[in-house]
Amino acid sequence: MVMRKILIVLCSLLLLFSCKKQEKDAAEIVGKTAKIYYDYLLHNNYEAFVDGSFRPDSIPPSYREQLIANAKMFIGQQKEEHLGIKEITISNATIDTLHHTGNAFLLFSYGDKTTEQVIVPMVERKGVWYMR
């Protein structure tokens, strides 16, 4: 009887820790995906950055062009205010597996030696993570 209780407790603990590992791995994917999207932006691939945003429906080409222009203006503003973004690293990432959402915490390192943490809300659709 005691052996059975110990076995149940051990199995429960094993299950608990295996779920945490899976959640951690999924959160890591959220962080890496957000970094990839922002690396596109950093390397002037504005189209890929814009395509990394979730939209339930297609958007008109004129609106897509406006989003691309906004991304270019953002990079221009960062160059003007901080001498540009020099590096993007992942600080942390969290995930809500029930709602298929997550947050990536990216650290921007600027040319003027300042840093800024940026939170990137993410959403998963059909196995792909997108920026919200």
What residue ranges belong to the model's regions?
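Short, low-complexity N-terminal intrinsically disordered segments enriched in polar/charged residues
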Residues: 18-43
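Short, compositionally biased low-complexity segments
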Residues: 5, 41-46
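Sec-dependent bacterial lipoprotein signal peptides
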Residues: 1-19
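N-terminal non-globular leader segments, chiefly Sec-dependent signal peptides
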Residues: 39-42, 51-57, 102-107
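Exposed beta-sheet edge and beta->alpha loop/turn motif
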Residues: 87-132
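Short solvent-exposed beta->alpha transition segments
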Residues: 31-32, 46-99
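Small side chains
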Residues: 12, 34, 102-104
